[in-house]
Amino acid sequence: MKSTRRSLNSKTTLNKEPKLSRTHAPADLSPVEWQRGLRRQFGREQAFGLENLTSEPFFSEFRVSNPASQSSYRVAIRGRGPGGNFCSCPDYATSELGTCKHIEFTLARLEKKRGAKAAFARGYRPAFSELYLRNDGRRRIHFRGGTDCPQGLRKAAAALFDLGHDGMLPDHRYDQLESFITMASKSGHEFRAYDDALDFIAGMRDAERRASKLAELFPRGAADPGLRALLKVPLYPYQAEGALFAVRAGRALVGDDMGLGKTVQAIAAMEILARHFGVTRVLVICPTSLKYQWQSEILRFSGKQSENAARVINGGRAQRQNDYRLDDFCKITNYEKLRPDLDLIAAWAPDLVIVDEAQRVKNWNTIAARALKRIDSSYAIVLTGAPLENKLEELISIVQFVDQHRLGPTWKLLHEHQVKDEGGRVTGYTGLAKIGQTLAPIMIRRRRSEVLKQLPDRLDQNLLVPMTEMQMFYHQENADVVAKIVQRWRKTRFLSDTDQRRLTCALQNMRMSCDSTYLLDQETDHGVKADELVALFDDLFAEPNAKAVVFSQWTRTHDIIIRRLEARGLGYVSFHGGVPSDKRPAL
């Protein structure tokens, strides 16, 4: 017997699947087989918890729990192969593999049970019928008739679904699905329509209704007079087009060149959604330095002046909790506060999320980026002025927030578009035009040259930036001097030459402190204005042959800007009154 046991163990070892590398695909496996194999391998190594939610021993619904992350997912087992099973985890929803580590873990546990081989050989044959969503290459609705399915329902299903392809619903028959669901629900037969399938159907219906409603509201499209009167300032034609595009898409990426007015397009879309599509809560997420800029422009463009029209979220946790409890139309927060405030945001439940300066989140695997993807909303508008076509990893992550299914699974996209050397190092990208076509339904991007004829000769834009605590100290110190001199002047009706000089100097110092403390002490550099300026350069210089001219009254302002340009490796020339006349022609 001992010899027999050793022989069985030896045979088991020989038949064990080889360990797969997570970074290099085996030559004898396709990318799909490799990715499925990785999930099978990883799932069977886990120590998850498993709970059967029904009395069925194999073809049942289970709860798979991960004690490490304290997360749990619903798993439905319908067979051994990919496609028919289901898991509520994000990987299953987006990988297009028809499996995940939770499904593979569950299968591994079930296969060890007595009767598993016979049960899986017989296959899944439930008494009830079900409508479900499959995502093994493309998301599609499927129908599976139960053993007790009435003949009338079977006949209706045969006319609607392609029973030769696992009950798949053809694209041209989605408009007939609602009546079928109604019929099945009233048949007296147990009919299950799962949430993910119903959500998918609802999303398609909502898109159709939005398009129909927009055509009714603005029959002339971007040229419709109703759009020109939408805000307190008239929209340029391309801005009206962008606003309509964002509303029609529901979740959209606006990637126009810097300076073309992405903010006003987002506010216009926000107004359309609020007036005609039931949006009552809007969350704006932007860099800290732009929060008050957003508040100012929402009030200016929309004409709303009440306190709850646009509230900036500031302060400690207690203050932010109080702010999120208030019944505001719009709340404005910054990236750094997303993770600690996720529970507050979820409780407030925004209908629309606007994400500004998305390109500033350089690493979309950061805490803030992961937190952003956990915010749930019916509508979303992402604004970025930087071209992302050649930054594939950043583009993937941004698009995942807008529409996690649009680009397909990351593993597949990188396999199709990354160019690697023999060592597996990424050396470039290929086929990027195909990505642009895939993104067309959710992404709009106009270059300045394309809309130049619609623009005035000059566009003025004032950007508000906050002052640091040290800047405020210098500013207030000089403001106190000004107040004392003015008070004495009003009292005596006389201003001495000394006081005139002190007054002028203090006012000048107040202005200089708004740039940076460096202008006053030549030692410290407290201030965000120069950093914001160079951040704008990052966007501007992403375009070839772009140039910028910066004017300042003070050469010390030039000095702090130059330091930042040199740190980024950006070329520049500096022209001021101290440049000798013989060197000026070269500049």
Regions found by a protein language model. Give the residues of each.
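Charged, low-complexity
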Residues: 2-5, 28-30, 54, 117-252, ...
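Short Cys/His-based metal-binding microdomains
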Residues: 69-122
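Hydrophobic anchor at the beta1->P-loop junction of P-loop NTPases
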Residues: 89, 254, 550
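Conserved Helicase C-terminal RecA-like lobe
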Residues: 227, 265-281, 453-480, 490-587
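Conserved SF1/SF2 helicase motif Ia
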Residues: 253-260, 265-297, 379, 544
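Conserved helix/coil segment N-terminal to the catalytic DExD/H
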Residues: 275, 317-352, 363-367
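Conserved P-loop NTPase motor "coupling/switch" region that bridges the ATPase
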Residues: 275, 279-281, 296, 300, ...
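Conserved helicase motor
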Residues: 311-320, 335-340, 360-366, 554-556, ...
